[in-house]
Amino acid sequence: MSFGSEYAVEIYVNRPFMDKPIIYQILPRLWGNLNEKLVRNCGVDVNGTGRFKDIDKSTLEYLKHLGVSHVWYTGVIRHATDCDKRGCVPSNPQWVKGDAGSPYSITDYFDVNPYLAVNPEKRMDEFDAMIKRTHAAGLKAIIDFVPNHVARDYGKYSPKPVRKGRDANGHPVLGALDDKTKHWLPDNDFFYYPGQPLKLPTKGTYREMPAKASGNIYSPEPSVNDWYDTVKINYCDFYTDTWERMYEVVCFWASRGVDGFRCDMVELVPTEFMGWLIKSVKKEFPDVQFIAEVYQKNLYGKYVREVGFDYLYDKSGLYDALHDIMTGNVNNGNAPLEQWQSARRITWNWQSLGDLQPHMLNFLENHDEQRLASDFFARKGRNALAAMYVSLLFNTAPFMLYFGQEAGEKGMDEEGMSGKDGRTSIFDWWSPASVRRLNLFIHGKGDLEPEEKALLERYKALLSFASGSDVIKKGVTYDLCYCNMYSAGFNIDKNFAFIRKYGEETILVVSNFGIQDSDMDIMIPSEAFEWLQIPQSESMNASTPVKVHVPACDGVMINLR
């Protein structure tokens, strides 16, 4: 191994796919809602909602042109809501989170939300039509699989009658056959507290007897910080009928054309079950992909190599590193950076992953995290462009963006249950202004603000390049930071540089996280020329720096061949 090879990655084991997936997460409830007259903490009849039909041909063509390959439809599976209109049956408001409810408090795994349909009685047909439109546009569809928990009233609204644990459509109903006199039995779907009523942190008369364990805590008395709107599913670490019931859930949606599942909070679910599930589903649907929401980096290898996930969130790795680097620079100005705010963390994280890197799902936004343009993060969407160059272009791993990110959505509305926290609420009926403008712009019915349009053009250029270029989708990576620590103008804590190469194409990418423009010399060592098999020339060699100008909080790409 030659010196510097630890800064290069060439061979990946168990690579799931050759192309680089680019995933667009979208909440249909918000996407198609063009209502401007919004009232905080108000219902669907006042604030409105988007529908399946709003994921139309124009929207999907826009996503395809943007460079997207997969659309993650969030909040599709039927969940608890306080709504009694548009075909919805309300759950108890004492535990429903927000008027619209949480998309992760599932009331029926085999149904979609009636409010997303023009005709609630035909909601499954409208969902199927959306999936067909997605495929017709050359895109793949992802939905959530929530294996850890369900809503407190799961099964209450399943098609009746329920006989022998199955509803009128033949689908299994979790908990229907449980023995509620026992705290735990291997054949029970839930955990019970015999003789103890549920004590909610909210005031009211809601009665659950016996209490069931909540999604994140084994207790009949969840706190306000717990997932008190949910009930924990009992899997055991060995095969049970519950495993089969959940297998039916995934196969039901895969048979309707769903191409992938983003699996929620899998660290709370036995790995024995998840491994069995993935293997079993892929026997029936070999092309279906599984993405895990995982936060413990020490478990990454297990979830890929043993459990069989195609991709994992790299929230605790690259996302956290870029978050701290951005906030350290944007919010602290020219103040000295702490080590955890240094761009060196990008290299450290990358080296720690090794051959797991192509299985990481890189992102800068999702429904759980604060918006880049929020006052709590980078303040403006353009201030995150330096991070975009790294997260999107540094390796072959997939990349995800959250709807409105490309237009600089700030997430600074006070919708209702979700206050002004820098996030776009998933609990309320709402319509973010920048998302409305983006929707109208796509359909030729309105325009974006100048700053939004400029940011969108940058995203289009970067995403379309990444999705259409073999050097990004398949190329090797060489980190140049170790050999530029003392290069003129290069700040190891604020700048990041790397090379991508595939075939005859070689590009240099440089990011500047600082708040001032930077002119720098980038040295390419002889080890890089040798390892990348690039012949040195009079104009490009190990002794002659590449002179680069990088605007503040931005990045550049330079074609070296």
Predicted ranges, named:
Residues M1-K140, N148-V150, G155-P159, D226, ...:
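N-terminal structural segment of carbohydrate-active enzymes
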Residues L532-P545:
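Solvent-exposed beta-strand/loop surfaces of large extracellular or lumenal domains
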Residues I26, L63, Y73, Y109, ...:
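Conserved, mostly hydrophobic/aromatic
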Residues L34, L38, T81, K97, ...:
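Loop/helix patches that line or flank the sugar-binding groove of alpha-linked glycan CAZymes
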Residues L27-G32, I77, N113-L116, P147-H149, ...:
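Short, flexible loop/turn elements at secondary-structure junctions
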Residues I22, A542-R561:
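C-terminal beta-strand-rich structural cap/linker in extracellular carbohydrate-active enzymes
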Residues M18, S105, Y115, N119-R123, ...:
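Alpha-amylase-like alpha-glycosidases and glucanotransferases acting on alpha-linked glucans and related
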